Amino acid sequence: MRYKIVIEYDGSNFIGWQKQNHNSNSIQEILEKAIFKFSKQHVTVYGAGRTDAGVHALGQVAHFDLTTDFETYIVRNAINYHLISHAIAVVHVEKTDTDFHARFSAKRRYYLYKIVNRYSPLTIDRNRAWLVHTPLNVENMIKAVCYIKGNHNFSSFRAKCCQSKSPVKTVDNLSITYNHPYIDINISAISFLHHQVRIIVGTLVECGKGYFPPEHIKTIMEANNRSYAGTTAPSYGLYFVKVDYS
């Protein structure tokens, strides 16, 4: 029986989604151990997105297989019982066909990046948003968005260690909402390059600081060179919001 689960987590104290060794503090391995504790079955949990260390999730999707046909509420409650000491929660469980794959069946992934633009330190949003002290010109950031949306070669916006075969991606939506001092950047695509969202955010922030005009984003894009783009925004401001499968 294949189970599809939706997971929420605070990524602050984890090395990221993907397990790296048998004793790693990864979300994937912690989930696998929790499932084993209630089912006595060794499973592999496949996630829709391999979030980095510090990245949070509101709606990460994953799947795994069990030989036992449990009621979905039992699966949810049992996993959460064994996650009680971790900042991870299973918020939804459903049974699905065996041809469903959390990663490869995904049609669109949605991310949110949170910025707080003020001089005072963060309290409630500490490790949950990027604190930018310099006043940002949000209007210029919004103007820059049009140069990023659409189908492009995103070589300037990928990490050097990115293993994706092609740098060409399609950003379906990129929008910025501003309610001083909070800036939310929402972005969606079928898939992303390694650090693509965080480099886009870092570049938009540099535009907002006045380092370059909005139209300079086009030059950065055409350069196909990581050194032309801005800094990689901190991981703790990034949230994996949800996944579409239709």
From Swiss-Prot:
Disulfide bonds: none annotated. The keyword Oxidoreductase does not apply. It is an enzyme of class 5 (isomerase). The keyword tRNA processing applies. Keywords: Isomerase, tRNA processing. Belongs to the tRNA pseudouridine synthase TruA family. Homodimer. This is tRNA pseudouridine synthase A. The lineage of its organism: Bacteria, Pseudomonadati, Pseudomonadota, Alphaproteobacteria, Rickettsiales. The gene is truA.
